[in-house]
Structure formats: C-alpha cells, structure tokens
From Swiss-Prot:
It comes from the Bacteria. This is Thymidylate kinase. It comes from Bartonella henselae (strain ATCC 49882 / DSM 28221 / CCUG 30454 / Houston 1). It catalyses: dTMP + ATP = dTDP + ADP. Its EC number is 2.7.4.9. Belongs to the thymidylate kinase family. Pfam families: Thymidylate_kin. One of its GO terms (molecular function) is dTMP kinase activity. Phosphorylation of dTMP to form dTDP in both de novo and salvage pathways of dTTP synthesis. ATP binds at G10, G11, E12, G13, V14, G15, K16, T17. One of its GO terms (cellular component) is cytosol. The gene is tmk.
Length: 215
C-alpha cells in the first residue's frame, strides 16, 4: 500500500483538530495528497452513528458493549469506504481518533474486555494500522477546562467531555500506557505547549519519518 496513515489521539480538548489542520497544510505544501477525517464519522453512515454515540443515549440505555459495537460498525464503514481506498491511491490520511480511543474509552476499567475489543478491532481494520500516532498529552484538569470552554462557545456537544476529573485522568494514563506498549508507533507530544511549538514538533517528526517512505 503506497499511502501513509497518521492518527491523532488524546483526551478531550487537547487540540487534535487544530494540529491535524496545520499538519495537512504543511503536507499540502510539500506536494502530498492529503485526506483529513475523523472517528467516529468520516462517511455519511458513520456520521449518523457519531451523532447517536456522542449524545450519550447508547451508554445510558444499552451499556458499553453495544457502544463498542456501534463504534466498530462506524469504523468498518470508514475504513472500507474512505481510509483504505485513500491509502491505496497513495494519499496521506490524517485521522482524528482511531483504534486507541476505543481501547481507552470503551476498555477503561474493563468496561469491555480486551479480548472482545481485539475481536472488534480485527473486524474493522482490514489489516491496516497507523504508521504514526501522535498522542497529545495534557493534564486532566487542563483538558476539562478546555472542553468546558468549547462547550460554552457551543462548538460541540460531546457526552464524553462531561465525565468527571478522575475518569479523565484515568483515560490520560491509559493513553500513556498504550504509548509505552507501542513506542515504535506513538509519538507523545506535550499538549500544554503553544499551538505553533506543537505543530513544529509534529512537522519535524513527519518530515523525518516520511522522507524515505513516500515519493
């Protein structure tokens, strides 16, 4: 497969969307064909599922397993209809959240067993995996402040942003643990730095890693 797959992970309000936009502009300037996308979402069908999931109705009425299954359904559609075809065409795909968010959000405290999540992941991935995952890491208190500010500005309404500080910190630690388990894929970025400092770090990493792998 001739393309390159980069994902962005982290808690709420860490700045993933901003950094994806800035990296896309950088890569466009270098002549790469870039696709930006997100999860849950990325296709018409997956966006419908996104709306349901972020409303919190599934978690409240059906529980974490059904929630994980719906995330997987959205991912299957997203991978088969958008990510895989784009990679086959040689595009650089930048995705806001992917498998690691499912591992953290649905797997935290064994809400859904790791074995079940592994099966769902296998169904969805079609053998693809990100070459680089940027983990934007900020303290949970900072994450909650940013998420609250975003809600006040009516930029988004997200069920997961409403979770208490303890849960947010547990998710942060779970992401960091994943990064320790797969250091070849993860790049942990201090999300408390300025937007430009973070963007430059990400650009430098991509330029170095992708130099010998893409034309």
């Amino acid at each position: 497969m001739s393309g390159y797959f980069i994902t962005f992970e982290g808690g709420e309000g860490v700045g993933k969307t901003t950094q994806i936009f800035l990296l896309a502009q950088h890569l466009y300037g270098k002549g790469y064909d870039v696709l930006t996308t997100r999860e849950p979402g990325g296709t018409a069908g997956a966006e419908v599922i996104r709306h349901i999931l972020l409303s919190g109705q599934v978690q409240q009425h059906y529980g974490p397993l059904i929630e994980a299954i719906l995330f997987t359904a959205a991912r299957i559609d997203h991978v088969s209809e958008v990510i895989m075809p784009s990679l086959q065409k040689g595009k650089v795909v930048l995705c806001d959240r992917f498998i690691d968010s499912t591992r953290v959000y649905q797997g935290l405290n064994d809400k859904v067993s790791s074995s079940t999540l592994a099966v769902l992941e296998c169904l969805a991935l079609n053998k693809i995996k990100p070459q680089i995952t940027f983990l934007l890491d900020i303290p949970a208190r900072c994450s909650m402040k940013r998420a609250n500010l975003r809600r006040e500005k009516a930029e988004t309404i997200d069920y997961f942003e409403k979770d208490e500080l303890k849960i947010q910190e547990q998710r942060r630690q779970a992401f960091l643990q994943l990064a320790k388990q797969e250091p070849h894929r993860f790049r942990v970025i201090d999300g408390t730095d300025t937007v430009e400092v973070i963007a430059q770090q990400i650009r430098d990493i991509c330029d170095q890693v992708m130099l010998d792998q893409l034309p």
